[in-house]
Every structure is written in structure tokens, then in C-alpha cells.
């Protein structure tokens, strides 16, 4: 199966905006553990929603930025920076 990391980055950005977070490419200096993403990962959507929901409830966090790093041929880590 083919894994489309761009789909998950777009999903995360859209979900962030839908729950009131702003996208800011400068919000890259603080992040929690990256989210595993790839063909074998079952919980990518749950994990993305969980992190973003938690950030949206934190009154000190208003901005996020979402990016990824490739860790293997079809495996990635998704980072959600916040500020």
C-alpha cells in the first residue's frame, strides 16, 4: 500500500484550524513527541486529533505548525509545534 504523508499534514492543518488554532510557520520551537505515521501505523488520526485537541484547550497555546521528517522508506514522524 502507498502511504500519502501530504494527506496527513493537510488533515492536521485543516483540523487545527477547525478547532480554533492558527497556523504559524514560526511555531516550531516547542513540540511534544512526534507522531508516528506510515503504512503500519494504525493511530495516526487519533494521535493528531489528541495533540491538537489538547493544545486548543490550553489557553497559552494559540498557534501551531505541522511538519514531518521521513524516518524510512515509507515511515515518517509528524511534528506539531506550538506557541
Tell me the role of every PLM-derived stretch.
Residues 1-39:
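Extracytoplasmic/periplasm-facing segments of secreted or lipoprotein envelope proteins
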Residues 33-83:
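Extracytosolic low-complexity repeat regions of secreted or lipid-anchored proteins
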Amino acid at each position: 500500500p502507498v502511504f500519502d504523508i501530504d494527506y496527513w499534514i493537510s488533515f492536521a492543518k485543516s483540523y487545527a484550524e477547525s478547532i480554533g488554532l492558527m497556523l504559524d510557520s514560526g511555531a516550531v520551537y516547542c513540540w511534544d513527541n512526534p507522531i508516528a505515521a506510515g503504512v503500519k501505523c494504525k493511530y495516526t488520526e487519533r494521535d493528531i486529533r489528541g495533540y491538537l485537541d489538547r493544545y486548543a484547550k490550553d489557553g497559552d497555546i494559540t498557534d501551531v505548525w505541522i511538519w514531518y521528517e521521513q524516518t524510512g522508506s515509507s515511515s515518517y514522524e509528524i511534528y506539531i509545534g506550538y506557541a
